[in-house]
Amino acid sequence: MAYFPGLNLLFIHVPKTAGNTVTSELIQYEPAQPPTKILLPGMDGLNRFELKDGFSEKKHANLRAYQATMPADLFKELTVVFVYRNPVDRLVSFFYSPHRSAERGDRVLGLREFFHLLRRHPTLDDYLGLDTPPFPRQLISLRFRSLDSDWTLLASRLGLGQVGSLPQYNASSVQGVRKTWPIFWLAMLATRHRLDFAYRLGCGFQTGLSSRRRLWPRKRLRL
């Protein structure tokens, strides 16, 4: 989503993983020229914006988009950061996101609708997978469930000094579907989204579903 040159950091904004929160904080600590923040007042929710960094024009750009536009010597030295959120919670949160209220109406998320989300929603591998070199220097995952503490660790690693707690923007609850969560989990395991769980387990992120996707060698750090 955004390149921070002074930090030598690329943040990939996976939807519904507190990306607005993290990028808002990173902008404050960027010692060089930060990405341009463009507010989106026409959208539902608070503090919705896009960032323009000269390499991608999309808020939720994937890693391949940056690989295609960045000089190779710059790309291969990057620290790539993303937030890992339980894949089921992430999709459920997307369904109930404030900006989808008109499309959703008063519908409650059921199994059929969840399968529809699985078919059209990108996987983590879609956002982070690479087929060919160059590859970034390292990949760091922040855990959504412990984002404050992981953010503090990342700030320490980047030499940002003492940082405060993260604010929360545009949260959508997943509590209303907790009873059906096991069914959604099984549904996800039946699709390509099952590979998202490997990012939490640190299993190498290999898809096993496509001969085109190959594991890109990287140093993965879990904070």
Locate each region found by the language model.
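Membrane-interface amphipathic segments in extracytoplasmic regions
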Residues: 1-223
